[in-house]
Regions:
Chain B
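Hot-dog-fold acyl-thioester-processing enzymes
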Residues: 1-85
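HotDog/MaoC-like acyl-thioester-processing domains
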Residues: 1-3, 87, 92-146
Length: 134, 146
């Protein structure tokens, strides 16, 4: 277990990099129950003006959750709160990078400002995670 | 046209979800949560969980069932074709494990208009079979061109 107490304001957390494959949105649709066709049907997505089928926002949020949980060795009890703003469309077959900086630290609790981006496209902004030693 | 705010404060009946091991494994695979505590009963118990534990973001699975009726309610009046998921917050408490029965209640907290867009804010509260709160969700949906 990484010690959250060792983190201090301004520290960067390790980046999480993940490239969703072409069919990831289909698997996430099944796992989550969200079968909105804009996520799984490229032709439907184009017909409503999108460049192609887009990633589920909540899947991207799950990557932000995972990126933050890494600092507690992925212990699911450590993540106490996560807020995100969805500000861009994410696409399959493009690398998603989650990065963050410690905003507050003390008493075994840390608050981390986080973003998720595909290249220069920030798909999640102003995300804030709060973690505490379980 | 101003947004109709009559539904502020409306609450929908609780939706019940029974948490199962294979759904936890499927969800953990889909989001890339690699830990054994999401897959192996004994691994989870050995680090203090009651049983195989769901990743925190599994909350979307049991919350979605409670959010659906709220988003589709004509009293709220959301135009789904122009709806975007604007922001999301979850606050977690008690972990959710295989065998848990989760009740989720949705309440409409805010409806307002800004820059020609309608903002619809819902709160979900999920509790387990022991009455312990497992997660609170705040869902902000934005509807363009209201």
């Amino acid at each position: 277990m990484s010690d959250l107490k060792d983190l201090k304001e301004g520290d960067a957390i390790p980046e999480l990099k993940v490239t969703p494959d072409k069919y990831l949105p289909h698997r996430y649709a099944g796992a989550s129950g969200d079968f909105n066709p804009i996520h799984i049907d490229p032709e439907f997505a184009k017909a409503v003006g999108l460049p192609g089928n887009i990633l589920h926002g909540l899947w991207m949020m799950a990557q932000v959750a995972r990126g933050n949980a890494q600092i507690a060795d992925g212990d699911p009890r450590a993540l106490k709160r996560l807020s995100v703003q969805f500000r861009g469309m994410g696409f399959p077959e493009q690398e998603l990078v989650v990065s963050g900086t410690v905003k507050e630290a003390g008493d075994g609790r840390v608050v981390i400002d986080t973003i998720a981006a595909q290249g220069g496209n920030q798909v999640i902004r102003n995300a804030q995670a709060e973690l505490a030693a379980p | 046209m101003p947004v109709n705010t009559d539904a502020i404060g409306k609450q929908w009946p609780a939706a019940t979800y029974e948490v199962g091991a294979e759904k936890i494994r499927e969800f953990a695979d889909a989001i890339g949560a690699g830990s054994d505590v999401h897959r192996d009963h004994e691994a989870a118990k050995s680090v203090g969980y009651r049983d195989l534990v769901a990743p925190p973001m599994f909350c979307v699975v049991y919350s979605a069932r409670a959010m659906g009726p709220a988003i589709l309610d004509p009293d709220v009046g959301i135009n789904l074709a122009t709806m975007l998921h604007g922001s999301q917050e979850f606050e977690w408490d008690e972990p959710v494990c295989h065998g848990d029965v989760i009740d989720t209640t949705t309440t409409c907290r805010e409806i307002y208009e800004k820059d020609g867009k309608g903002f619809y804010v819902f709160e979900t509260i999920s509790t387990n079979q022991e009455g312990k709160q497992v997660v609170k969700g705040t869902w902000t949906n934005i509807v363009r061109g209201v």
